[in-house]
Amino acid sequence: PAGVLIGPYAHLNLHGSVTVTTADAIAFDQGNFYATGENTYTALSQSPTGSLTFSNASPGSIVNEGDISVAPGETVTLTGGAVVSTGELSAPEGSVTVAAIPSESTVKITQPGSLLSLEIDPIVPIATDSTATDSNVTISPLDLPSLLVASEHKHADSLSVNSDGSVSLTANTANAANAESQFSIGAGSTVVSGSITVDNFSANTASGQIAILGERVILTDAMLSASGQGGGGNINIGGAHKGHFSLPSAHETFVSADTQISADALTRGDGGNVVVWADDTTQYLGDI
């Protein structure tokens, strides 16, 4: 699809897992489900394999302003060309993955053992920095303290989806005219400005896993929690520890001062693992 918008009054409370994606195809054991065109539904009787195909050079964006929750142990996955979540995502004892896929790729989300992994195989070569034409991307994490973090001057308070599929944050300025400024978030950007929880309060076992991934990862006024009665879970922002290949690494990662991240052991066990990573630039102002 060209894009997915989940509005502020939407509430999804599901017993199973949920995947929201702008992929062109979702792989099953015996075939693919295609977003457009004809499908052979008899081949889709088995479970999805976790493989998504993005064949569009500019995959559609996802904006979530609502609340999505699933049953304990299930998963919530949001994958698109750019992903913005200002609502609530909840998967107790399970996993939440929010990932931006900037170009034509095949994506496979797996959980070997107890660790989440995400593989991205480009369908066509990705342009290098010297040849890329990423004109929609007008925000870098170094700009965000003045653009997104609430201050006496301005703060981002609404979202809009442009005709080209890009997403804009709209900030009200404090001048007399109360003019608006828009900051475009292009392909490969993941923005979280809501809550994501995978806590485990029901048993003495560890919590679940959270992964926020993309070429540019932005957390502003966000709350991420992977705490559990028997131990904390894993939170990966921008990639894995030391850029390990199990997760794609961001080029730039920004975490605002009003973002809170926790992976606590509530009654027993060890605290969890929190990784904030970028290959090029990481700016971290929040609390862990």
What are these regions, as identified by a protein language model?
Residues P1-I288:
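Extracellular and secretory-pathway beta-repeat/beta-biased strand scaffolds
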